[in-house]
Amino acid sequence: MFVDSVELLISSGKGGAGAISFWTEKFVIKGGPDGGDGGRGGSVFFKVDNNTDTLSGLRGRNHIKAENGRPGEGRKKYGRKGQDTTIIVPPGTTVVDMETGEELLDLVEEGQVVKFLEGGKGGLGNMHFKSSTNQRPTYAQPGLPGITKQVRLEMKLIADVGLVGYPNVGKSTLIATLSNARPQVANYEFTTLTPKLGVVHISDYDSFMMADIPGIIEGASDGRGLGLEFLKHIERTKTLLLMIDAANYREMKYQYETLLVELDRYSETLAGRKHAIAITKIDSLSQDEVNTLTQTFLDDIGLKANDTLKKYKADMNYLSYGFKTDFGVPLPIKEPLFVLPISSVAHLNTEALRYALGDFVKNVKEETEAEEK
């Protein structure tokens, strides 16, 4: 089961107490202090592991605690350090302080290890408190307490392409068609209640990750429907595929503008994501009807149909649009990279979409890397 958020009480270990002890030996009547120091308490670490894809393994573990340090002993023996605890999380996990709402950690990179809570320091044994006026001190320090925090772990999916659209627009069917994912598919709204990931293969050596995310509705950024949960998950997707239902009673321009408004209201970062458009369910209409709707939509958003997507073997009997990429020409931000009518059920233009998205992801990655240099 997918769990995208879990609340935990996390504590580092308490430091061990310093020992009060005096040297004992035959013929030694009053030996000096020899109490050793207590061991440091165990620390708590977070580690990012690509082999973990949910937070479900942490469910039920209400209190995660590192081991306390052991107390010191006589003969100046130090107490053993408490054992550290490492919490394994998937990439894309954030750690939020439940008391303040502050985001404490953002765990993204595979293999990343971060110390979260330091263990308490061990107390000093009485051997440290001998002085000229006190040869046999009877005092040793207690260990310092560990640190406890109430946190919420949130997992935000990291995918190359996030599918965005109204409920029942065909996201689950598309991801099942293009990838190895098998999301629940049915003809009613909010079939997808939790995000799903699928790997879309371009070749034996090339692939990208696609996220099927719960449908968006007007007011999603205010928390209506599954809105805020949905938007939280697409924050990290690198590109967006906006899906518009050709058979929906809402006109396509309205669907498109609603999606853009909700993205913009929720996050400037999301509003700046590069996107493409798939016009779905064209098998339920005639070719002429689809072309009429597509032409109207392109006119409404100021674009002209062209044959740019022919290189991906798109069916040219259907109108489509593709941005003509060229070396040194930045990808568009406010307009779609391409507009392609598809039918996942009839497998119409789905292979063209696969390869167009593959190039889209590649181009965005190259552009991002160039900007970071």
UniProtKB/Swiss-Prot annotation:
One Pfam match: GTP1_OBG
Binding-site residues for GTP, renumbered to this chain: 165-172, 190-194, 212-215, 280-283, 343-345
Keywords attached to this entry: Cytoplasm, GTP-binding, Hydrolase, Magnesium, Metal-binding, Nucleotide-binding
Domain Obg: 1-158
Basic and acidic residues: bias regions: 64-76
Required cofactor names: Mg(2+)
Enzyme class: hydrolase
Gene3D superfamilies in UniProt: GTP1/OBG domain (2.70.210.12), P-loop containing nucleotide triphosphate hydrolases (3.40.50.300)
E.C. numbers: 3.6.5.-
InterPro entries: G_OBG (IPR031167), GTP-bd (IPR006073), GTP-bd_Obg/CgtA (IPR014100), GTP1-OBG_CS (IPR006074), GTP1_OBG_dom (IPR006169), GTP1_OBG_dom_sf (IPR036726), OBG_GTPase (IPR045086), P-loop_NTPase (IPR027417)
SUPFAM superfamilies: Obg GTP-binding protein N-terminal domain, P-loop containing nucleoside triphosphate hydrolases
Domain OBG-type G: 159-362
Function: An essential GTPase which binds GTP, GDP and possibly (p)ppGpp with moderate affinity, with high nucleotide exchange rates and a fairly low GTP hydrolysis rate. Plays a role in control of the cell cycle, stress response, ribosome biogenesis and in those bacteria that undergo differentiation, in morphogenesis control.
NCBIfam families, alphabetized: Obg_CgtA, PRK12299.1
Subunit record text: Monomer.
Protein's recorded name: GTPase Obg
Organism: Sulfurovum sp. (strain NBC37-1)
Phylogenetic placement of the source organism: Bacteria, Pseudomonadati, Campylobacterota, Epsilonproteobacteria, Campylobacterales
